[in-house]
C-alpha cells in the first residue's frame, strides 16, 4: 500500500485556503436584493450576509406593523438570494471538494 504524499496534501490544502480567501473577498462585492410589498421595502445584502441598504417608501410609514412585516420579508428574501449566490461561488472555487453549507457556517452565513 502506497503512503500518501503529505507534502502534496499540504500544498493542496494551502491552495484551497487561498481560493477560499479569494472567494470571501468576492462575496463582499456581490450584492443581492430582496423586496416586499410590491417594492415598497427593498433590502440589499452582500455575499457575506451583511445588510448594506434598506429603503422604505415614505408613504407606508404610518402603518408600523406593515412596515415591520415588509422589512422582515425583504431582508429575508435578500439573505436567501445572497446565501444561494455564496453557495454557488464556493462550489465553483472548491471544485466539489468542500461542502459549501459547512463553509458558510464557518464564515457566519446561514449555510
Curated annotation (Swiss-Prot):
Cellular localization per UniProt: Cytoplasm, Nucleoid
Name assigned to this protein: Nucleoid-associated protein Cpar_0834
Function noted in UniProt: Binds to DNA and alters its conformation. May be involved in regulation of gene expression, nucleoid organization and DNA protection.
Cellular-component GO terms for this entry: bacterial nucleoid; cytosol
Signal peptide per UniProt: none
SUPFAM superfamilies in the cross-refs: YbaB-like
Keyword terms, alphabetized: Cytoplasm, DNA-binding
Coiled coil start-end: none
HAMAP family for this protein: DNA_YbaB_EbfC (MF_00274)
NCBIfam families according to UniProt: DNA_YbaB_EbfC
Subunit structure of this chain's protein: Homodimer.
Origin species: Chlorobaculum parvum (strain DSM 263 / NCIMB 8327)
MF terms (GO), sorted A to Z: DNA binding
Family the UniProt entry places it in: Belongs to the YbaB/EbfC family.
Amino acid at each position: 500500500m502506497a503512503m500518501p504524499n503529505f507534502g502534496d496534501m499540504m500544498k493542496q490544502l494551502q491552495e484551497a485556503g487561498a481560493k477560499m480567501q479569494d472567494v470571501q473577498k468576492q462575496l463582499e462585492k456581490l450584492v443581492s436584493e430582496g423586496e416586499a410589498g410590491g417594492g415598497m421595502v427593498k433590502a440589499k445584502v452582500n455575499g457575506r450576509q451583511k445588510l448594506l441598504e434598506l429603503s422604505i417608501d415614505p408613504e407606508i410609514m404610518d402603518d408600523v406593523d406593515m412596515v415591520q412585516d415588509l422589512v422582515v420579508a425583504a431582508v429575508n428574501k435578500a439573505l436567501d438570494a445572497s446565501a444561494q449566490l455564496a453557495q454557488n461561488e464556493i462550489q465553483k472555487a472548491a471544485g466539489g471538494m468542500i461542502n459549501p453549507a459547512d463553509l458558510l457556517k464557518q464564515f457566519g452565513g446561514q449555510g
